[in-house]
Amino acid sequence: MSRIHPTAIIEPGAQLHETVEVGPYAIVGSNVTIGARTTIGSHSVIEGHTTIGEDNRIGHYASVGGRPQDMKYKDEPTRLVIGDRNTIREFTTIHTGTVQDAGVTTLGDDNWIMAYVHIGHDCRVGSHVVLSSNAQMAGHVEIGDWAIVGGMSGVHQYVRIGAHSMLGGASALVQDIPPFVIAAGNKAEPHGINVEGLRRRGFSPDAISALRSAYRILYKNSLSLEEAKVQLSELAQAGGDGDAAVKALVDFVESSQRGIIR
């Protein structure tokens, strides 16, 4: 029995594993590759130079691999690469990259992308990320592993959201959120360490304590950013369980181009 509904359109050149399921009225473009056991919901459009891995579930009316919403785009063969075991719900839009960046939009593994999410051109989404309904990512946004973005939030282009961080719902984010930090508001401000999330992911009490100390240095001790960087670097060499996590935070702050929320 065919796994492709008779009303679906699979353009010549598309490469689908024999176990892929395609629902009614869906369209799969000629430059698309889809891995084993992935399902495509009814009326969805998968187009562009798009590669999708295994065991993904793409909901109804999703638009995956569409042209970048960038006026500089001139039909270059830019790409979208999606990993394995992602859930992409109804009416989500994910666009290919642009030549002004690396030319590729990427989505890792095991992500939970809820309805009406937008992932713009050149975004880099890690793994185990949750993007809640109506969260909107502008172009070039980077999201670290295990991050959560609340529903109806807007993220400015080129912003980075650190690993294990959390952005509350209906927030407007215009600068980077460091790893492990909770932020919320319009515009988004820091509100502590994501303690519950870190516990669920197996961070030790000592590591969480070290990150709390790092947060106080960065946000509570009335230090300039340069002064805070010095103290954070010292904390990252304390010889405890939290050294690696604090170092990841320090490296993120040091590499920020738009500046961090403060």
Curated annotation (Swiss-Prot):
Compartment list: Cytoplasm
Gene Ontology cellular component terms for the protein in this record: cytoplasm; membrane
Keywords linked to the UniProt accession: Acyltransferase, Cytoplasm, Lipid A biosynthesis, Lipid biosynthesis, Lipid metabolism, Repeat, Transferase
Tagged with keyword Transport: no
Family annotation (PROSITE patterns): HEXAPEP_TRANSFERASES
Keyword hit for Lipid biosynthesis: yes
Catalysed reactions listed for this entry: a (3R)-hydroxyacyl-[ACP] + UDP-N-acetyl-alpha-D-glucosamine = a UDP-3-O-[(3R)-3-hydroxyacyl]-N-acetyl-alpha-D-glucosamine + holo-[ACP]
SUPFAM superfamilies linked to this entry: Trimeric LpxA-like enzymes
UniProt pathway annotation: Glycolipid biosynthesis; lipid IV(A) biosynthesis; lipid IV(A) from (3R)-3-hydroxytetradecanoyl-[acyl-carrier-protein] and UDP-N-acetyl-alpha-D-glucosamine: step 1/6
GO MF term set: acyl-[acyl-carrier-protein]-UDP-N-acetylglucosamine O-acyltransferase activity
GO biological process, one term: lipid A biosynthetic process
Gene3D superfamilies, sorted: Hexapeptide repeat proteins (2.160.10.10), Udp N-acetylglucosamine O-acyltransferase, C-terminal domain (1.20.1180.10)
InterPro entries, per database record: Acetyltransf_C, Acetyltransf_C_sf, Hexapep, Lipid_A_LpxA, Trimer_LpxA-like_sf
Top-rank taxon, per record: Bacteria
EC assignment: 2.3.1.129
Complex and partners: Homotrimer.
Function: Involved in the biosynthesis of lipid A, a phosphorylated glycolipid that anchors the lipopolysaccharide to the outer membrane of the cell.
Protein family: Belongs to the transferase hexapeptide repeat family. LpxA subfamily.
Name of the protein in question: Acyl-[acyl-carrier-protein]--UDP-N-acetylglucosamine O-acyltransferase
Organism annotation: Burkholderia thailandensis (strain ATCC 700388 / DSM 13276 / CCUG 48851 / CIP 106301 / E264)
